[in-house]
Amino acid sequence: MGKHLVLIGGGHAHMVTLAMLHTFIEKGHRVTVIGPSDHHYYSGMGPGMLGKTYTPAEIRFKTRHVVEKQGGTFVCDKADNILAEEKTVLLASGETVSYDVISFNAGSYVPRLDLPEDAQDVYSVKPIERLMEAQARILELVARKKITIGILGGGPSSAEVAGNIWQLTRNVRGPAPAIKIFAGNRFMSRFPDNVSSKIQKVLTQRGIEINTDGYVQSVRSGMVTLASGKTQALDFIFLAMGVVPNPIFKNAGLATGPDGGLLVNEFLQSIDRPEMFGGGDCIYFQKQPLDKVGVYAVRQNPVLYHNLMAALEGEPLQSFDPGGDYLLIFNLGGGIGVLRKRWLLTEGKIAFVIKDYIDRKFMKKFQAIE
Protein backbone atom coordinates (compact mmCIF):
# COMPACT_ATOMS: atom_id res chain seq x y z
CA MET A 1 0.00 0.00 0.00
CA GLY A 2 1.30 3.45 -0.93
CA LYS A 3 2.35 6.08 1.59
CA HIS A 4 1.79 9.84 1.83
CA LEU A 5 4.64 12.25 1.11
CA VAL A 6 4.12 15.88 2.13
CA LEU A 7 6.37 18.70 0.93
CA ILE A 8 6.28 22.00 2.79
CA GLY A 9 7.41 24.70 0.36
CA GLY A 10 8.38 24.60 -3.30
CA GLY A 11 11.81 26.17 -2.98
CA HIS A 12 15.22 25.45 -4.51
CA ALA A 13 15.89 22.28 -2.47
CA HIS A 14 12.62 20.69 -3.64
CA MET A 15 13.04 21.48 -7.35
CA VAL A 16 14.25 18.01 -8.42
CA THR A 17 11.63 16.33 -6.24
CA LEU A 18 8.92 18.49 -7.83
CA ALA A 19 10.24 17.74 -11.31
CA MET A 20 10.19 14.00 -10.52
CA LEU A 21 6.89 13.99 -8.64
CA HIS A 22 5.40 11.53 -11.11
CA THR A 23 7.90 8.86 -10.00
CA PHE A 24 6.36 8.83 -6.51
CA ILE A 25 2.85 8.61 -7.98
CA GLU A 26 3.92 5.76 -10.29
CA LYS A 27 5.06 3.76 -7.25
CA GLY A 28 1.64 4.15 -5.66
CA HIS A 29 2.42 6.97 -3.23
CA ARG A 30 0.36 10.13 -2.68
CA VAL A 31 2.09 13.50 -2.76
CA THR A 32 0.80 16.74 -1.26
CA VAL A 33 2.68 20.02 -1.65
CA ILE A 34 1.82 22.88 0.71
CA GLY A 35 2.92 26.42 -0.18
CA PRO A 36 1.82 30.01 0.47
CA SER A 37 1.53 30.82 -3.25
CA ASP A 38 0.81 29.05 -6.53
CA HIS A 39 4.28 30.18 -7.65
CA HIS A 40 7.76 29.98 -6.19
CA TYR A 41 10.04 32.96 -6.82
CA TYR A 42 13.79 32.47 -7.17
CA SER A 43 15.30 34.74 -4.51
CA GLY A 44 18.66 34.99 -6.31
CA MET A 45 16.96 37.01 -9.06
CA GLY A 46 14.76 39.04 -6.69
CA PRO A 47 16.96 42.16 -6.58
CA GLY A 48 17.18 42.06 -10.39
CA MET A 49 13.39 42.01 -10.57
CA LEU A 50 13.28 44.99 -8.19
CA GLY A 51 15.55 46.86 -10.59
CA LYS A 52 13.45 45.74 -13.61
CA THR A 53 16.20 43.63 -15.16
CA TYR A 54 13.72 40.73 -14.95
CA THR A 55 9.96 40.50 -15.05
CA PRO A 56 8.17 38.54 -12.29
CA ALA A 57 7.33 35.79 -14.80
CA GLU A 58 11.02 35.27 -15.57
CA ILE A 59 11.95 34.46 -11.98
CA ARG A 60 9.08 32.25 -10.89
CA PHE A 61 8.20 28.58 -11.08
CA LYS A 62 4.57 27.43 -11.46
CA THR A 63 4.47 25.15 -8.43
CA ARG A 64 0.74 24.37 -8.40
CA HIS A 65 0.67 23.62 -12.13
CA VAL A 66 3.70 21.30 -11.96
CA VAL A 67 2.30 19.42 -8.96
CA GLU A 68 -1.21 18.94 -10.33
CA LYS A 69 0.03 18.10 -13.83
CA GLN A 70 1.86 15.08 -12.41
CA GLY A 71 -1.01 13.84 -10.26
CA GLY A 72 -0.08 15.43 -6.94
CA THR A 73 -2.20 17.67 -4.70
CA PHE A 74 -1.32 21.32 -4.14
CA VAL A 75 -2.63 23.16 -1.08
CA CYS A 76 -2.23 26.95 -1.01
CA ASP A 77 -1.71 27.46 2.72
CA LYS A 78 0.99 27.84 5.36
CA ALA A 79 2.22 25.25 7.85
CA ASP A 80 1.60 26.69 11.32
CA ASN A 81 2.57 23.81 13.58
CA ILE A 82 3.90 20.26 13.48
CA LEU A 83 2.38 17.54 15.65
CA ALA A 84 5.35 15.21 15.28
CA GLU A 85 4.00 12.34 17.38
CA GLU A 86 0.79 12.26 15.33
CA LYS A 87 2.69 12.84 12.05
CA THR A 88 0.36 15.73 11.30
CA VAL A 89 0.84 19.31 10.09
CA LEU A 90 -1.55 22.02 11.27
CA LEU A 91 -2.16 24.69 8.62
CA ALA A 92 -2.91 28.40 9.06
CA SER A 93 -6.43 27.78 7.74
CA GLY A 94 -7.10 25.32 10.57
CA GLU A 95 -6.92 22.30 8.28
CA THR A 96 -4.68 19.35 9.15
CA VAL A 97 -2.61 17.14 6.85
CA SER A 98 -1.21 13.79 7.97
CA TYR A 99 1.94 12.29 6.48
CA ASP A 100 4.18 9.24 6.43
CA VAL A 101 7.23 11.15 5.21
CA ILE A 102 7.59 14.93 5.20
CA SER A 103 10.18 17.35 3.83
CA PHE A 104 10.59 21.02 4.67
CA ASN A 105 11.90 23.70 2.34
CA ALA A 106 10.09 26.42 4.25
CA GLY A 107 12.75 29.06 3.71
CA SER A 108 13.63 31.92 6.01
CA TYR A 109 12.31 35.33 6.89
CA VAL A 110 13.58 38.77 7.88
CA PRO A 111 12.87 39.69 11.55
CA ARG A 112 10.58 42.72 11.71
CA LEU A 113 12.15 44.59 14.65
CA ASP A 114 8.93 44.75 16.67
CA LEU A 115 7.23 47.02 14.14
CA PRO A 116 3.97 48.72 15.06
CA GLU A 117 0.93 47.28 13.29
CA ASP A 118 0.24 50.54 11.45
CA ALA A 119 3.79 51.01 10.09
CA GLN A 120 3.64 52.31 6.52
CA ASP A 121 6.14 52.08 3.67
CA VAL A 122 8.21 49.45 5.50
CA TYR A 123 8.97 46.40 3.36
CA SER A 124 11.04 43.27 3.99
CA VAL A 125 13.08 41.67 1.22
CA LYS A 126 11.32 38.33 1.82
CA PRO A 127 9.01 36.96 0.63
CA ILE A 128 10.12 37.96 -2.87
CA GLU A 129 6.57 38.99 -3.76
CA ARG A 130 7.07 41.98 -1.44
CA LEU A 131 9.73 43.30 -3.81
CA MET A 132 7.08 43.72 -6.52
CA GLU A 133 4.92 45.78 -4.17
CA ALA A 134 7.96 47.78 -3.06
CA GLN A 135 8.95 48.50 -6.66
CA ALA A 136 5.54 49.98 -7.47
CA ARG A 137 5.47 52.03 -4.27
CA ILE A 138 8.97 53.47 -4.79
CA LEU A 139 8.11 54.56 -8.33
CA GLU A 140 4.92 56.17 -7.02
CA LEU A 141 6.81 58.11 -4.34
CA VAL A 142 9.71 59.30 -6.51
CA ALA A 143 7.25 60.66 -9.08
CA ARG A 144 5.94 63.05 -6.41
CA LYS A 145 9.06 64.41 -4.69
CA LYS A 146 12.64 63.74 -3.67
CA ILE A 147 12.60 60.92 -1.14
CA THR A 148 15.07 59.18 1.15
CA ILE A 149 15.14 55.38 1.10
CA GLY A 150 16.70 53.52 4.02
CA ILE A 151 17.91 49.92 3.81
CA LEU A 152 18.45 48.24 7.17
CA GLY A 153 21.14 45.56 7.13
CA GLY A 154 24.79 45.33 6.24
CA GLY A 155 24.99 42.11 4.24
CA PRO A 156 24.68 41.04 0.58
CA SER A 157 20.92 41.57 0.53
CA SER A 158 21.21 45.24 1.49
CA ALA A 159 23.96 45.80 -1.09
CA GLU A 160 21.97 44.20 -3.91
CA VAL A 161 18.74 45.97 -2.97
CA ALA A 162 20.51 49.35 -2.79
CA GLY A 163 22.16 48.86 -6.18
CA ASN A 164 18.93 47.80 -7.83
CA ILE A 165 16.91 50.65 -6.33
CA TRP A 166 19.52 52.94 -7.88
CA GLN A 167 18.95 51.19 -11.23
CA LEU A 168 15.16 51.38 -10.86
CA THR A 169 15.11 55.11 -10.15
CA ARG A 170 18.01 56.56 -12.13
CA ASN A 171 15.97 57.33 -15.25
CA VAL A 172 12.68 58.38 -13.68
CA ARG A 173 11.32 61.89 -14.00
CA GLY A 174 12.06 64.08 -11.06
CA PRO A 175 14.91 64.04 -8.55
CA ALA A 176 16.67 60.76 -7.81
CA PRO A 177 16.12 59.45 -4.27
CA ALA A 178 18.77 59.51 -1.58
CA ILE A 179 19.66 55.88 -0.78
CA LYS A 180 21.12 55.06 2.63
CA ILE A 181 22.28 51.68 3.97
CA PHE A 182 22.25 51.27 7.76
CA ALA A 183 24.88 48.55 8.13
CA GLY A 184 25.34 48.34 11.89
CA ASN A 185 28.99 48.56 12.90
CA ARG A 186 30.50 47.16 9.70
CA PHE A 187 29.38 46.71 6.11
CA MET A 188 29.60 43.15 4.66
CA SER A 189 31.17 41.92 7.90
CA ARG A 190 31.03 38.22 6.92
CA PHE A 191 33.34 38.83 3.97
CA PRO A 192 37.03 39.68 3.57
CA ASP A 193 37.93 43.36 3.37
CA ASN A 194 38.76 43.18 -0.34
CA VAL A 195 35.22 41.95 -1.11
CA SER A 196 33.44 44.55 1.03
CA SER A 197 35.63 47.38 -0.28
CA LYS A 198 34.85 46.52 -3.93
CA ILE A 199 31.12 46.46 -3.25
CA GLN A 200 31.33 49.64 -1.19
CA LYS A 201 33.24 51.39 -4.00
CA VAL A 202 30.57 50.56 -6.59
CA LEU A 203 27.75 51.76 -4.34
CA THR A 204 29.36 54.94 -3.02
CA GLN A 205 30.37 56.04 -6.53
CA ARG A 206 26.63 56.18 -7.23
CA GLY A 207 26.00 58.39 -4.23
CA ILE A 208 24.67 55.60 -2.01
CA GLU A 209 25.51 56.33 1.62
CA ILE A 210 26.66 53.50 3.91
CA ASN A 211 26.13 54.23 7.61
CA THR A 212 28.23 52.24 10.12
CA ASP A 213 27.43 54.32 13.22
CA GLY A 214 25.69 51.45 15.01
CA TYR A 215 22.65 49.23 14.78
CA VAL A 216 19.09 50.37 14.30
CA GLN A 217 17.25 50.07 17.60
CA SER A 218 13.69 50.71 16.43
CA VAL A 219 11.66 51.37 13.30
CA ARG A 220 8.56 53.50 12.94
CA SER A 221 6.74 54.85 9.90
CA GLY A 222 9.07 57.44 8.41
CA MET A 223 11.89 57.09 10.93
CA VAL A 224 14.55 54.81 12.40
CA THR A 225 16.35 55.22 15.71
CA LEU A 226 19.93 54.03 16.14
CA ALA A 227 21.27 52.47 19.34
CA SER A 228 23.02 55.80 20.04
CA GLY A 229 19.63 57.53 20.16
CA LYS A 230 20.23 59.34 16.87
CA THR A 231 17.20 59.39 14.57
CA GLN A 232 16.94 59.46 10.78
CA ALA A 233 13.85 60.49 8.83
CA LEU A 234 13.08 58.14 5.93
CA ASP A 235 10.28 58.05 3.37
CA PHE A 236 10.67 54.36 2.60
CA ILE A 237 12.31 51.57 4.61
CA PHE A 238 13.61 48.18 3.49
CA LEU A 239 14.28 45.47 6.07
CA ALA A 240 17.27 43.52 4.73
CA MET A 241 18.86 42.23 7.92
CA GLY A 242 20.05 38.64 8.19
CA VAL A 243 17.37 36.02 7.65
CA VAL A 244 16.40 33.40 10.23
CA PRO A 245 14.70 30.03 9.67
CA ASN A 246 10.97 29.50 9.99
CA PRO A 247 10.17 29.23 13.74
CA ILE A 248 7.87 26.25 13.21
CA PHE A 249 10.48 23.67 14.31
CA LYS A 250 11.34 25.30 17.62
CA ASN A 251 7.66 25.87 18.35
CA ALA A 252 6.99 22.17 17.74
CA GLY A 253 9.69 21.08 20.19
CA LEU A 254 11.87 19.50 17.50
CA ALA A 255 15.67 19.42 17.68
CA THR A 256 17.02 22.62 16.14
CA GLY A 257 20.35 24.29 15.52
CA PRO A 258 21.41 27.51 17.26
CA ASP A 259 19.59 29.55 14.61
CA GLY A 260 16.30 27.67 15.07
CA GLY A 261 16.62 25.65 11.87
CA LEU A 262 15.60 21.98 11.82
CA LEU A 263 18.67 20.02 12.97
CA VAL A 264 19.47 17.42 10.30
CA ASN A 265 22.09 14.70 9.93
CA GLU A 266 24.19 13.81 6.88
CA PHE A 267 21.07 12.43 5.17
CA LEU A 268 19.23 15.80 5.50
CA GLN A 269 17.04 13.94 7.98
CA SER A 270 15.84 15.25 11.35
CA ILE A 271 18.08 13.84 14.07
CA ASP A 272 15.08 12.78 16.16
CA ARG A 273 12.32 12.16 13.59
CA PRO A 274 13.45 9.70 10.87
CA GLU A 275 10.39 10.43 8.71
CA MET A 276 11.26 14.16 8.58
CA PHE A 277 13.68 15.75 6.08
CA GLY A 278 14.55 19.26 4.95
CA GLY A 279 16.74 21.49 2.82
CA GLY A 280 17.61 25.10 2.11
CA ASP A 281 17.56 27.97 4.60
CA CYS A 282 15.21 26.28 7.08
CA ILE A 283 17.64 23.53 8.18
CA TYR A 284 20.80 23.43 10.28
CA PHE A 285 23.28 20.86 8.97
CA GLN A 286 24.70 19.05 12.01
CA LYS A 287 28.11 18.25 10.50
CA GLN A 288 28.99 21.86 9.67
CA PRO A 289 27.13 25.19 9.59
CA LEU A 290 26.23 26.17 6.02
CA ASP A 291 25.93 29.72 4.72
CA LYS A 292 22.39 30.67 3.77
CA VAL A 293 23.05 30.78 0.05
CA GLY A 294 21.10 29.13 -2.75
CA VAL A 295 24.02 26.99 -3.92
CA TYR A 296 23.58 24.60 -0.98
CA ALA A 297 19.87 24.17 -1.66
CA VAL A 298 20.70 23.37 -5.29
CA ARG A 299 23.32 20.82 -4.20
CA GLN A 300 20.83 19.25 -1.79
CA ASN A 301 18.26 18.68 -4.56
CA PRO A 302 19.26 15.21 -5.83
CA VAL A 303 20.06 13.90 -2.34
CA LEU A 304 16.72 15.04 -0.96
CA TYR A 305 14.86 13.45 -3.88
CA HIS A 306 16.73 10.15 -3.43
CA ASN A 307 16.22 10.08 0.34
CA LEU A 308 12.51 10.90 0.21
CA MET A 309 11.96 8.04 -2.21
CA ALA A 310 14.21 5.77 -0.12
CA ALA A 311 12.31 6.62 3.08
CA LEU A 312 9.01 5.72 1.40
CA GLU A 313 10.41 2.53 -0.14
CA GLY A 314 12.51 1.33 2.80
CA GLU A 315 15.79 1.71 0.90
CA PRO A 316 19.22 3.00 2.10
CA LEU A 317 19.69 6.76 2.41
CA GLN A 318 22.35 8.81 0.62
CA SER A 319 24.72 11.23 2.38
CA PHE A 320 24.88 14.90 1.45
CA ASP A 321 28.29 16.37 0.69
CA PRO A 322 28.16 20.19 0.86
CA GLY A 323 31.17 20.43 -1.46
CA GLY A 324 33.93 23.00 -1.39
CA ASP A 325 34.06 26.72 -2.00
CA TYR A 326 31.30 28.13 -4.17
CA LEU A 327 31.00 30.88 -6.75
CA LEU A 328 29.46 34.02 -5.29
CA ILE A 329 28.26 36.89 -7.49
CA PHE A 330 26.50 40.01 -6.25
CA ASN A 331 24.14 41.87 -8.61
CA LEU A 332 24.69 45.54 -7.81
CA GLY A 333 22.40 46.90 -10.52
CA GLY A 334 23.30 48.84 -13.62
CA GLY A 335 24.66 45.67 -15.23
CA ILE A 336 27.51 45.54 -12.69
CA GLY A 337 28.43 42.60 -10.47
CA VAL A 338 31.12 41.58 -8.01
CA LEU A 339 32.38 38.00 -8.40
CA ARG A 340 34.31 35.95 -5.85
CA LYS A 341 35.60 32.39 -6.18
CA ARG A 342 38.50 31.27 -3.98
CA TRP A 343 41.36 33.67 -4.87
CA LEU A 344 39.55 35.29 -7.78
CA LEU A 345 37.81 38.60 -7.15
CA THR A 346 36.56 40.87 -9.90
CA GLU A 347 33.94 43.52 -10.50
CA GLY A 348 32.23 44.88 -13.58
CA LYS A 349 29.93 43.88 -16.41
CA ILE A 350 31.45 40.43 -16.95
CA ALA A 351 30.59 39.42 -13.36
CA PHE A 352 26.95 40.36 -13.91
CA VAL A 353 26.84 38.61 -17.31
CA ILE A 354 28.04 35.37 -15.67
CA LYS A 355 25.44 35.62 -12.90
CA ASP A 356 22.69 36.45 -15.37
CA TYR A 357 23.62 33.42 -17.52
CA ILE A 358 23.70 31.02 -14.55
CA ASP A 359 20.41 32.30 -13.11
CA ARG A 360 18.53 32.24 -16.41
CA LYS A 361 19.84 28.73 -17.16
CA PHE A 362 18.68 27.50 -13.73
CA MET A 363 15.21 28.96 -14.21
CA LYS A 364 14.81 27.68 -17.77
CA LYS A 365 15.77 24.17 -16.67
CA PHE A 366 12.93 23.97 -14.16
CA GLN A 367 10.45 26.13 -16.06
CA ALA A 368 10.80 23.60 -18.91
CA ILE A 369 8.84 21.01 -16.89
CA GLU A 370 5.86 23.37 -16.59
Task: Show the residue positions of the predicted features.
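A Rossmann-like FAD-binding core segment of flavoenzymes
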Residues: 74-77, 81, 169-266
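Internal hydrophobic alpha-helix adjacent to the cofactor/substrate pocket in enzyme cavities
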Residues: 170, 295-323, 329
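FAD-site-proximal beta/loop scaffold in flavoenzymes
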Residues: 120-145, 231-299, 306-307
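Beta1-alpha1 glycine-rich phosphate/pyrophosphate-binding loop at the start
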Residues: 1-72, 160-191
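FAD-binding core/adjacent interface of flavoenzyme oxidoreductases
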Residues: 1-4, 69-150, 238
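C-terminal auxiliary extensions adjacent to catalytic cores
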Residues: 334-370
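Rossmann-like NAD(P)H-binding beta-loop-alpha module
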Residues: 134-176
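Short hydrophobic core segments
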Residues: 8, 98-109, 216, 233-243, ...
